[in-house]
Amino acid sequence: MENIDNAAAESAAAGYFRIALGVEYKGSRYRGWQRQEDGVPSVQQTLETALSKVAASPVSLHCAGRTDAGVHASGQVVHFDTRAVRSAKAWVMGANSHLPHDVSVTWAQEMPAHFHARFKACARRYRYVIYNDQIRPAHLGDQVTWNHRPLDIERMAEAAAYLVGTHDFSAFRAGQCQAKSPIKQIHHLRVTRHGKMIVLDIRASAFLHHMVRNIAGVLMTIGAGERPVAWAK
């Protein structure tokens, strides 16, 4: 954190402003948040291109949490440093005028130099929605996971309780995960049914690559009766 604070002080001394933005996006067309070297579309690159036009200079973004390919966001927070003097409204309206229909900036605010979207985040929250019916949905395909097997919500909720707290989530991370430690703390994991929809609401200090979708996969397997509840341990 000391290096980050020093960098923030240097940026402020050089006449830079730190701007935070609220962002929402539909991730279906993107290879996740992170900028891709091979030119494959990413949310980060799309936003940086739009903001650079508003700032009339290159913009480099830092986010609260990197989302995987196909993942949507409704409350992503990002920040960047710039010498460009713009009002909050100008950042929002200007960025949105250069963004595609599936990415939107919802608010902007100048922040103190020590603010950091990633390291000042208190927690990250995901909502994973399962469409549980024999017939696949026609209009929700890229916003839900379809599971045709009858899922027992009580078994899923019981299994979810094992995951709350601080644990080693190595079994739930992707092989290419770059996180230094598999130890993460889940603050809240609730499983509820709303008709054909089963919603997993999960809040944690941070997540590993593919951690949420792997948790969902384990809970669905248990809910289908293919594994015992204790398999989630």
Which residues make up each language-model segment?
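Structured-RNA-binding interfaces characteristic of tRNA pseudouridine synthases
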Residues: 1-233
